[in-house]
Amino acid sequence: YWGMRVVYVALAAGAVFAVYINGVAEGWWPAWGERPTVAATTTPPINPAPTASATASGEAAMSGGYQIGPDGVLVRPAEHAASTYTKPQLPEEAKENTERGAELAAEYLLDTLTYAWNTGDTQLFEDITESGDNFRETYIHNVNELYSHGWMYDNSSTLTRIVSVEPVTDPKWNAQPNTIGVVFNVVTSNGTSCVNKRIITSNEFNVSVIFFMTWKDGRWVATRGEVLHDAQE
C-alpha cells in the first residue's frame, strides 16, 4: 500500500473546511445553499431583522429560528450541546505495543478528532498526537478558529474499511523508529455548523486516512497524519 500512486492529495478535510468557514465569516462567498442577495429588491427578506420594538420588549433576537447570542453568534441548540457528547476512551488493547494496539489507537484518534469538532475540546486529540506535526497543528487551529465565532454538532467519521496495518520501514517515508502505518477508509461529514449567524450543513463524503502511529515512551502517538481524496493504489 505504501507504494500507492496518489491521483490527487487534498489538504486535511478540516483545513479545507476552515478556509470555507472563514470565507463565509468574512463575507467572501455565501454559505452552502444560500443565494447571494440582490442590492435592489422589493421582496422582503424571509427572516427580517428584529425590529426595535421587539428587542426593546425583552424578546430575544432571532435569525432563522435560532436565538442570537450577546456575542452576535447564533445560540447552539441545547439538545446538541457540547455536554451531550461523551469523551472517547482509549481501549486497554490500544496500550499494547502490537500492530493491533496501533490500529486501535488510530481508531481512538479518529474518535478524539470527531469529539473535538463537536465540542471544541481538543485536549484528547492533542494528547495522542505529536506536537509540531502539521496534521495535528492544523486541526487544533481549525477547531479553535471555528469555536471562536461558532460551533458544530453531528460531525461524524465512520470507519468502513481497515486497508492496511503494517510497519513503516522504507527510508523514503522518513518515519520515526517503531512506527506502524495505519490506513482507513472513512465516511465523514461535518454535520451542522454555525459561523457567526450562518448555518452550514454538510453531506457525507469518502476519504482515506493515513496515520503513522509510533510507539514512544510506552504508548502509541500519531507522528504523522494525512487525508487522501481520490486515491488509487
Predicted regions and their residues:
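Exposed beta-sheet edge and beta->alpha loop/turn motif
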Residues: 2-9, 16-42, 166-233
